[in-house]
Structures are given as C-alpha cells and as structure tokens.
C-alpha cells in the first residue's frame, strides 16, 4: 500500500510543479507585453492613418475628406473617418486599356475576374467614354484600431498587398 501512496504523491507533486511553472511562464509573457499607451486609445481611425503614413515616410496630401499619399512611389488614396474603425484604401488608375480594342478589353475583364479570385483586394475597371478607355483600380476595406499589435507593420503589409495584386493581374 505504501508504494501506491508514494507513486500518487509523486505524480501529484509533478503535476503541481508543472502548473506552477506554467503560471510563472504566463506571468512572464503578460509582463513582457507593453501596456497600451493611454494617449493612443482615443485616437480615431483617420488620425491613426495619418500618423502611420507619416511614420512610413509617405508624402501625404489631404483633399476634402480623402487622404492622398505616395507609398513606394505608388499613389494611393484612403477614405477614413474617426467615427468608424474601418477604412478604404484605393490604388487608383494603375492600368489602362483602350476600349476600342475588343480583344484587350476581353483580356482585361478576364484578368480582373481571375485576380479577384486570387487576392484580398478588389480589382475594378471603370469606363471613361470621352477618353475611350478603361482604367483599372483596386481597393481594400479593412479594420484599423490603435489596439491592433504593431499597426505600422499592419498598414505596411496591407499596402504591400496592392503590389501583389498588380503582379497577379499582370500574370493572369
């Protein structure tokens, strides 16, 4: 009977030690996470966008409610409000197709449809009758809040995805 009690005590002790070690590791993880900056908690999406774009060294121009900026030599536009956590990024007019060339128009439409199946962004085309052309553009609606970890890297990765979209479109 004594050996069985000894084994049970040994197992209980091992379990207790493992639990204490797990608690200690969890406490270390929690303590290593920097507390959120209270001054950023009240910042709205639009203001956060502007702050992050400046941190990314983007040339920023505000026109009415829209934010125009250059990121890696590409022109973008953001629609954002401090009243909503969502914003829309537009990559405007990055390709053009002559509307009189039927074959190019058909290829463009197929490429737009196929690209929309493969990427996160939405690829669109707009017809300009006076110029007799179609312009290709893309957009992405996403969430941006101060408590997303590393918001600068998040926005940068989101913008980088537009380059992937163009690459995908050109390869279709």
Regions found by a protein language model. Give the residues of each.
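A short acidic-to-branched-hydrophobic micro-motif
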Residues: 78-98
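Ampiphathic alpha-helical segments that act as solvent-exposed interaction surfaces
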Residues: 106-120, 141-172
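Ordered, soluble secondary-structure elements with a strong preference for glycine-centered loop motifs
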Residues: 43, 99-102, 148-153
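Short, internal acidic amphipathic alpha-helical interface segments
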Residues: 91-139
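Hydrophobic residues embedded in beta-strands of well-ordered beta-sheets
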Residues: 66-68, 85-87, 134-136
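Charge-rich, low-complexity N-terminal segments
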Residues: 4-81
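Short beta-strand-to-loop capping motifs
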Residues: 71, 91, 140-144
């Amino acid at each position: 009977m004594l050996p069985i009690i000894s084994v049970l005590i040994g197992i209980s002790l091992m379990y207790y030690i493992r639990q204490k070690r797990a608690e200690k590791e969890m406490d270390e993880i929690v303590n290593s996470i920097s507390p959120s900056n209270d001054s950023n908690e009240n910042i709205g999406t639009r203001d956060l966008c502007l702050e992050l774009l400046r941190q990314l060294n983007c040339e920023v121009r505000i026109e009415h409610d829209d934010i125009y900026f250059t990121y890696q030599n590409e022109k973008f536009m953001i629609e954002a409000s401090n009243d909503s956590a969502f914003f829309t990024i537009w990559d405007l007019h990055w390709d053009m197709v002559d509307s009189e060339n039927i074959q190019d128009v058909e290829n463009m439409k197929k490429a737009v449809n196929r690209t929309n199946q493969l990427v996160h962004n939405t690829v669109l085309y707009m017809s300009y009758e006076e110029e007799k052309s179609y312009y290709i553009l893309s957009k992405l609606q996403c969430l941006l809040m101060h408590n997303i970890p590393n918001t600068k890297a998040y926005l940068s990765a989101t913008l980088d995805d537009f380059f992937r979209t163009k690459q995908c479109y050109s390869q279709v």
